[in-house]
Amino acid sequence: MFPMVTGFMNYGQQTIRAARYIGQSFMTTLSHVNRLPVTIQYPYEKLITSERFRGRIHFEFDKCIACEVCVRVCPIDLPVVDWELETNIRKKRLLNYSIDFGICIFCGNCVEYCPTNCLSMTEEYELSTYNRHELNYNQIALGRLPMSVIDDYTIRTILNSPQSLIKMGKPPLIKD
């Protein structure tokens, strides 16, 4: 054939192919028009976390036996466990437990392999600070309950229980 005719045929095929691609893209766009937006206005609306969300780690000091399994299974050897051996009872006594959330990758291995279940994952994800040293949580900060639990009226904390109020010399709160 003539070179000019084959050039027009190639141009025509490329034009048809380009129109088909544009049509497919337009159909994909139209299929998403009727969907609801998924954007969350963050400071004003909070994200509803899933059931298996891995947020900040909660630590219960009384349950920990200082076995250091959490340190061994952590990919970055992050939890710092300080303990001393009680020779008279032949057991370890936990002195200090801390996790630096600036380094933590929130893999959840420490929670999964803990034999006494003293570690658990919370739904708290707002850990931003201006100073990275504030992300180093000790056993007191790790044991603190999230604000969502503290503000829940169905949960009574130990601090507000009638027994603790009597021990502190305050009259117990009576709710009608």
Swiss-Prot record:
Its main location: plastid. The keyword Repeat applies. One of its GO terms (cellular component) is chloroplast thylakoid membrane. Keywords: 4Fe-4S, Chloroplast, Iron, Iron-sulfur, Membrane, Metal-binding, NAD, NADP, Plastid, Plastoquinone, Quinone, Repeat, Thylakoid, Translocase. It is found in: Plastid, Chloroplast thylakoid membrane. [4Fe-4S] cluster 2 binds at residues 74, 104, 107, 110. GO terms for biological process: photosynthesis, light reaction. Binds 2 [4Fe-4S] clusters per subunit. It comes from the Eukaryota. Residues 55-84, 95-124 form the 4Fe-4S ferredoxin-type domain. It holds the Pfam family Fer4_9. The keyword Cytoplasm does not apply. It is a peripheral membrane protein. One of its GO terms (molecular function) is quinone binding. [4Fe-4S] cluster 1 binds at residues 64, 67, 70, 114. NDH is composed of at least 16 different subunits, 5 of which are encoded in the nucleus. NDH shuttles electrons from NAD(P)H:plastoquinone, via FMN and iron-sulfur (Fe-S) centers, to quinones in the photosynthetic chain and possibly in a chloroplast respiratory chain. The immediate electron acceptor for the enzyme in this species is believed to be plastoquinone. Couples the redox reaction to proton translocation, and thus conserves the redox energy in a proton gradient. Belongs to the complex I 23 kDa subunit family. This is NAD(P)H-quinone oxidoreductase subunit I, chloroplastic. It comes from Populus alba.
